[in-house]
Amino acid sequence: MAAAVAAPRLISLKAVAKLGFREISQIRQLAPLHSAIPHFGMLRCRSRQPFSTSVVKAQATATEQSPGEVVQKVESPVVVITGASRGIGKAIALALGKAGCKVLVNYARSAKEAEEVAKQIEEYGGQAITFGGDVSKATDVDAMMKTALDKWGTIDVVVNNAGITRDTLLIRMKQSQWDEVIALNLTGVFLCTQAAVKIMMKKKRGRIINISSVVGLIGNIGQANYAAAKGGVISFSKTAAREGASRNINVNVVCPGFIASDMTAELGEDMEKKILGTIPLGRYGKAEEVAGLVEFLALSPAASYITGQAFTIDGGIAI
């Protein structure tokens, strides 16, 4: 939702409170793909013979091992987090820093806030550096990754969180408002993911978590640009997950709903009541709750078999 991103506009909150989310009426069946692309619906076992006993035993042995025995655990992983100076990005940076990660805190304009985040991580006993840059620009992304590599020698996890809103109704939306949101929220994710994959492929290991939004799944009035970008992040991440799987690179998506922020705190009682009425759990989410999910996907051995998935953390809005 709009409240899950930096500096959202009130129009989206009003629209949701007034009209709610429209339920998708039908799901269209996709036409058959070109024959050059595998048709997964036709996959079948070529052999009528049962699996060999040795294969079954090998699978059983693997499942009996704990996740920590199957998956190599990285000590003090190096993490790059975009848009990490405030809000959800800040909560993620602090959670991963507290977990022992070495964190690069990216920011666009909030240098002072980013330094405070880095300071807090160091107070936890971790390591952190800051980097000011626009992730919609390839030169800035390359410089950011190089900064982390020069400092720590590797990059284990990338969290793409940076984003903006330029909310207005579709019929009033200027192309500049469309372009700005697509550039940062979608192209920025592409550039950072591409740069990260190049590094991770060499060592055959890595995790990428892209922060989307429940709006990317169900849309929202006044946010055509934002919905397009966040929906694109989900589809892009699924493709990246397929391409990175052979090199043990996991790519997943987190889709927050209404997350408590300075903006939600300023809403009147009537407006808040209407908004909460659209959330089955009846409350806003917390940035720390989103950070907890990201921490699991980024660090837990139990998440090693999860890739290409979009996780909603929205109080039930997208049910």
Swiss-Prot record:
Residues the record lists as binding substrate: 213
Pfam family, any one: adh_short
PROSITE patterns: ADH_SHORT
Residues found modified as N-acetylalanine: 58
GO biological process, one term: fatty acid biosynthetic process
Subcellular location, record wording: Plastid, Chloroplast; Plastid
InterPro entries for this protein: 3oxo_ACP_reduc, NAD(P)-bd_dom_sf, Sc_DH/Rdtase_CS, SDR, SDR_fam
One term under GO cellular component: chloroplast
Residues the record marks as active site: 226
Pathway recorded for this protein: Lipid metabolism; fatty acid biosynthesis
Chain residues that bind NADP(+): 81-105
The protein's Enzyme Commission number: 1.1.1.100
Lineage top rank: taxon: Eukaryota
Keyword entries, A-Z: Acetylation, Chloroplast, Fatty acid biosynthesis, Fatty acid metabolism, Lipid biosynthesis, Lipid metabolism, NADP, Oxidoreductase, Plastid, Transit peptide
GO molecular function term, any single one: copper ion binding
Plastid in keyword set: yes
Entry annotated with the keyword Lipid biosynthesis: yes
Signal peptide coordinates: none
Transit peptide: 1-57
Subunit structure: Homotetramer.
NCBIfam families in the cross-refs: 3oxo_ACP_reduc (TIGR01830), PRK07231.1 (NF005559), PRK12826.1-2 (NF009466)
Family recorded in the similarity comment: Belongs to the short-chain dehydrogenases/reductases (SDR) family.
Annotated protein name in UniProt: 3-oxoacyl-[acyl-carrier-protein] reductase, chloroplastic
Species of origin: Arabidopsis thaliana (Mouse-ear cress)
